[in-house]
Amino acid sequence: MIFASSNRHKYEEFRRMLSDLIDLKFLEVDYLEPQGEDTREIVVTSAKWLSNYIREPFFIEDSGLFIEALNGFPGPYSSYVFKKIGNEGVLKLMNGVENRRAFFISVIALSYGRGIEVFEGRVQGTIAREVRGGGWGFDPIFIPNGSNKTYGELGDEKDRFSHRGASCRKLREFLMRFGSDRLP
């Protein structure tokens, strides 16, 4: 099965979480990603477009950080916002803000012979007051509920807590039920 993305970090996370089930190949590709407010709609539209070029089963994933005090910003624009202002910029926007509630969402679209299946994971949490730990993207500033560590401080343990881990577990259940080797 193929994971199509321009983000190798995502591939590494999925490969780690699915390695006992499938041989996941990475197709590094930039693809049409329409701008919009609905992450699910974005990923389904992108998967339909990619299915014109990729003939074997593949999946893509899109995610976003939604901060309550910022009316859901950066949301589906998370990648762009991270590239432009990074973690420090988001923390600057949150300076003096007491409500630090946020959630991360991950939406996977699996494209195969019978169509497209969608799997969503969502994790509630808070925005840290400073950058903590490593990782990539917003990992060093997002603290999932049930932890006192940021994603960046969790290392590989992040998979148990993360939005991507949650959507991947749903994909995994589907592949186990359907049979990943029998996808048309």
Swiss-Prot record:
The record places the active site at: 62 (proton acceptor)
Q: What is this protein called?
A: dITP/XTP pyrophosphatase
SUPFAM superfamilies to which the protein is assigned, alphabetical: ITPase-like
Is Transferase included in the keywords of this UniProt record?
no
Q: Report keywords, A-Z.
A: Hydrolase, Magnesium, Metal-binding, Nucleotide metabolism, Nucleotide-binding
Q: What is the lineage of its organism?
A: Archaea, Thermoproteota, Candidatus Korarchaeia, Candidatus Korarchaeales, Candidatus Korarchaeaceae
GO biological process assignments: nucleoside triphosphate catabolic process; nucleotide metabolic process; purine nucleoside triphosphate catabolic process
The record describes its quaternary structure and partners as: Homodimer.
Report the family membership: Belongs to the HAM1 NTPase family.
- Cofactor note, please? Binds 1 Mg(2+) ion per subunit.
Residue positions binding Mg(2+): 33, 62
The protein's matches in NCBIfam families, at most eight in alphabetical order, are given as: RdgB/HAM1 family non-canonical purine NTP pyrophosphatase
